[in-house]
């Protein structure tokens, strides 16, 4: 087997001054062909999931933590020969307490983009809680993916994903109905509860992102209007009620296809930050916008790229 190396660049910030930043490269050695990494920071520690494939194209989802300046022994969470393995739509995970929830994709039919989201819930020790269970229970042979997961402070997880169940139907003009984005909660026993559609028309293949503020879960994604404006939108749950989605900023980017470029959101108490790619007015840019009000509104975006950007 060929040996591949994944290099992880970690920013280590020392407390002496805010300017003392050292970038340290940490090598990660693992046999097989490895790809689709998902690196997560939780309570001061790092964890990583990735897909390995063997010479027969069997895929496995692996999990590892970085503790005490070294990687723990890898755990294989799931194995299959019927997976959808893709550079843009990849597995993700989150840690809540002593549990880790991971996602991966399985083909549901012969179509190129007919696949379902499967989940695996276990303790960090490796003890299985619920294995290989499906997230989207609609039963339609359509695209389901682009998953984001975050821990719920009350134990369990919040999860969001793109759901293509409606794309099998057609509009009056003959075009297929658009992709949707959905949300659910996963309990610490692996039950799927409080599932809801957040938006009935979103970009088909742009990554989603989710965070948890003191008010509740907040989701950002690339919207899709009837006029093919594909700007970044945000919606949040306050007092267990999801608010109407609003734009993070009105870029006005019109594009007649999916750019495969989703946003990223992070939060700290009432502060929320969203970054995203846009080509507003024909000028590629990576923007960053901040909210001091739990994501209810955002300030003007800050362009953070000096040169031309592609995503």
What are these regions (language model features)?
Residues 4-13:
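Sec-dependent N-terminal signal peptides
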